[in-house]
Amino acid sequence: MIGKLKGIIDSYGEDYVILDVQGVGYQVHCASRTLQALPSPGEAATLSIETYVREDQIKLFGFRTDTEREWFRLLQTVQSVGAKVALAVLSTLPPHDLANAIALRDKAAVARTPGVGPKVAERIVTELKDKVPALSAVDPAVVKLSGAIDDNRAPRAVADAISALVNLGYGQPQAAAAVATASRTAGEDAETAQLIKLGLKELSK
C-alpha cells in the first residue's frame, strides 16, 4: 500500500492532482481545501495517501496531514458515508472545525456539505462524538460550552455573542470556539459586546 507520495505537481483536475514521482504520474483525489493549498505545477509537494484497491481499479486519496487522513477514515465508519462524501465534508470543514462541530453537536454545520442531508449529518455528529477526543485536540472550553448549551446553562451573553457572530457569517463551530476563548479571557461576567469584540479578534488571527 502507498502511504505517502513526494514529488512534483504536474497538473490539476477538478477533484485531483497529478503528482509526478520520479517520472511516474500519480492521480491523487483530494478535498478542495487540500487542492487549494497545494503549490503551482512544477513545484514540490508531499501528500499522505490512502489507497483504495478494488477489482477494477486502484484509487489514491491525498491529504496534507496524517490527521486529515485519519478523519477521512473515521468519517467512513458512519453509515451512508463513503469516500466521496468524506472528501466533501473535509472540503467544507477542516479537521479542527469538524471536531468542534461534533463536540458542539452542530449538525447544521456538517449539513452545509454538498450531498450531506440532515439525517447523515445527524449520524456523523452522533456516531463520532465519542471518537473526536482521540483524533483531534478539541478546545476544552468548547467542550465545556457544549455541555452548558445542551443543559441550557450557558450565560445569556455567551449565547447572544455566538448568535451575533453566526449572523455575521461565521460558522457555528468557529463562533462558539471564538466566544469560548473570549469568555475565558474576559471572565464569566463579560457582557455580550465585549465577547463579540474579543471573539472577532480571535477569528481574525
UniProtKB/Swiss-Prot annotation:
Residues 154-205 are annotated as: Domain III. Residues 65-143 are annotated as: Domain II. GO terms for molecular function: ATP binding; four-way junction DNA binding; four-way junction helicase activity. Gene3D superfamilies: 5' to 3' exonuclease, C-terminal subdomain, DNA helicase RuvA subunit, C-terminal domain, Nucleic acid-binding proteins. One of its GO terms (cellular component) is cytoplasm. The keyword Cell cycle does not apply. SUPFAM superfamilies: DNA helicase RuvA subunit, C-terminal domain, Nucleic acid-binding proteins, RuvA domain 2-like. Belongs to the RuvA family. This is Holliday junction branch migration complex subunit RuvA. It comes from Rhodopseudomonas palustris (strain ATCC BAA-98 / CGA009). The gene is ruvA.
